[in-house]
Regions:
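Short glycine-/small-residue-rich Rossmann-like dinucleotide-binding loops
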Residues: 17-19, 55, 111
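Short, small-residue-biased leader/transition segments that mark boundaries at the very start
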Residues: 1-3
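Internal alpha-helical scaffold of NAD(P)-dependent oxidoreductase catalytic cores
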Residues: 66-86, 90-167
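Rossmann-like NAD(P)(H) cofactor-binding subdomain of soluble oxidoreductases
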Residues: 21-89
Length: 168
């Protein structure tokens, strides 16, 4: 199990799991994202940032932050955990290229928005993404909800474009 090793030796963790559509519903199934938080957070000690990459409904990151805070309190581990949302924009067949050379980087943190709180996520993101940022890749820092909405909107726009071209 790599999770205890990751918890012990990393202070940045990425969640990139599927969020399929729920059966008989249009809602996203976020149980896999939630499971990562439930499994990882109790093993953490020290300062940690978790970047969510998955497409999730607006409000999920804030709910995951509340869950992480509750797990830290429940397990009594000496950890601070910050959830940030950093959606990916990968084209089919270009995943590696789009990861190394993204056309934009979006980061949602709790340090932005109507009730800002101190955030370590932006500084860490600037370190992680230093190579593309050095090439002037747009870096958009916003609140959690807006970052989630940017990804959902991009997916909806792509689906609309595909529907229109299929109709032609």
């Amino acid at each position: 199990d790599a999770l205890p090793i990751s918890a012990a030796f990393a202070n940045l963790h990425f969640i990139g799991v599927g969020t399929p559509q729920q059966r008989g519903s249009y809602a996203a199934d976020t149980r896999y994202v939630e499971a990562v938080i439930e499994d990882l957070v109790p093993k953490l000690e020290g300062d940690h940032v978790i970047f969510g990459k998955s497409t999730v409904p607006v409000g999920t990151a804030a709910a995951l932050q509340a869950k992480a805070d509750a797990l830290v309190a429940e397990h009594g581990n000496k950890a601070t955990v910050e959830i940030a949302w950093n959606p990916e924009f990968l084209r089919e067949g270009y995943a590696v290229k789009d990861t190394i050379e993204p056309d934009r980087i979006v980061l949602g943190t709790r340090g932005n928005g109507p009730d800002p709180q101190p955030s370590r996520a932006e500084g860490i993101a600037r370190e992680v993404y230093a190579p593309p940022l050095a090439k002037d890749t747009p870096f958009i820092v916003t609140d959690l909800q807006t970052a989630e909405l940017v990804k959902v909107s991009a997916n909806a726009f792509l689906a609309t474009k595909i529907s229109f071209i299929n109709a032609v």
